[in-house]
């Protein structure tokens, strides 16, 4: 039996819509990374972009487990200005309450993808939006019920 390698003409991309309301961030990001890479398809080829396009709505309503949104001992995000002593620290709770809560999902997914040209191309197929509306209605995205797959995927408490 020969190893299968998909050709560019054989790759078909679908549009998937995920509602992030009350979903656990890490579990959502792990599943989205698998879909973006195309590892959920039988025609997966490691060196080609064969994943689907993913649209995530209601990014501000994603949940964190445990005490990760706490400012004292929670989850921290670091960035550096490039100047000596220029490290900046923010918490996950502050990011979710800011004007751009979709960044927390983008960072989680980006860090689960490979850090090379293909990973950057696959990350460009992710679209995250703050509210219920999105401009991709013409692509007719298929709603993916991520919350119904496992009871651990959803969090009902107001943790943040």
Swiss-Prot record:
Ranges annotated as spanning the membrane: none
Transport keyword on record: no
GO biological process, one term: negative regulation of translation
GO cellular component annotations of the record: cytosolic large ribosomal subunit
An annotated Gene Ontology molecular function: mRNA binding
Pfam families: Ribosomal_L13
Superkingdom of the organism of origin: Bacteria
Entry keywords, A to Z: Ribonucleoprotein, Ribosomal protein
Family: Belongs to the universal ribosomal protein uL13 family.
Subunit-level organization: Part of the 50S ribosomal subunit.
Cited function: This protein is one of the early assembly proteins of the 50S ribosomal subunit, although it is not seen to bind rRNA by itself. It is important during the early stages of 50S assembly.
Name used for this protein in its record: Large ribosomal subunit protein uL13
Protein's organism: Orientia tsutsugamushi (strain Ikeda)
Lineage, top ranks: Bacteria, Pseudomonadati, Pseudomonadota, Alphaproteobacteria, Rickettsiales
């Amino acid at each position: 039996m020969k190893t299968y390698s998909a050709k560019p003409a054989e790759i078909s991309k679908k549009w998937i819509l995920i509602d992030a309301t009350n979903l656990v961030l890490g579990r959502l990001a792990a599943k989205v990374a698998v879909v973006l890479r195309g590892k959920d398809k039988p025609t997966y080829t490691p060196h080609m972009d064969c994943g689907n396009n993913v649209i995530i709505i209601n990014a501000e309503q994603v949940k964190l487990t445990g005490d990760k949104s706490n400012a004292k001992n929670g989850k921290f995000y670091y960035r550096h200005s490039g100047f000596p002593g220029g490290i900046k620290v923010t918490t996950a709770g502050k990011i979710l309450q800011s004007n751009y809560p979709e960044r927390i999902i983008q960072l989680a997914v980006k860090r689960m993808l490979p850090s090379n040209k293909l990973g950057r191309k696959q990350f460009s197929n992710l679209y995250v939006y703050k509210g219920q509306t999105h401009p991709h209605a013409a692509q007719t995205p298929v709603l993916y019920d991520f919350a119904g797959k496992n009871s651990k995927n959803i969090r009902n408490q107001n943790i943040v």
